[in-house]
Amino acid sequence: MEKPEWKPRSDKPRSDKPRSDKPRSDKPRSDKPQERKPFAKRPLLRRELERRVRKFAEPDIPVEITGEELEKRVRFQLTSLAIENAEAVAKHLVALDFFLETDPERAYWHGQSASHRAGRLAIVRERAGIAAVKHGKFDVALRELKAAHRMSANPSILPYIAECERALGNPRKALEIAGSIATNKLTDVEQVELRITSAACRIELGQMDAAVVTLTCKELNLADAPWGNRLRSAYSAALIAANRGNETLPWGK
């Protein structure tokens, strides 16, 4: 089979003549100084914020909340925001705390509003994440809390992250996180919550006796502690799961 003959794109021979015989001039095109056109002005931050807020339906803030109720250390962190935005974020954070136990869904939306306005602040993402945990929005909570931990490296966030992983069906991941935490950097409440989460993971993995061991601690005997009922309920549930429900409860001795 003969190879097809190659043909140039045009039958016209290429010219060896340069495009122009006129030598280039070293003289500038104009003696006038060249003026650069200014860049388009960036839209005002306030306008950007208003546009973003319009896309997000924020919950109403009770009229009695001023934002001044927020802890001073948190208010200080809001000083990097525009004044009006800082005031709005402060009010949302106060409302979040106010509704956290009585109306978790409303607290959740206040947290999302604050995060939408000030997502670059670790404390805002942390509070929003905790509210999401309380409302059972564990996927949202995990995103918020991981972002907060990346920004602040606050160990107090890790027990909540572990709880989210467990709730999302990742008990091994939750135990891995729990094992990486230096518990001496946690408050008593955070340590107890971490024990409860870890024990729940053990039960889900079929490690019933390990769950009982995890919950066996001196805090079981602290009747007036705020975590008392939750800890004792978790301990009793672990005993039942391990078929040891007839054992004497340690706080009854």
List each model region and its residues.
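Structural register within alpha-helical repeat arrays
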Residues: A95, R127-A128, I161, S198, ...
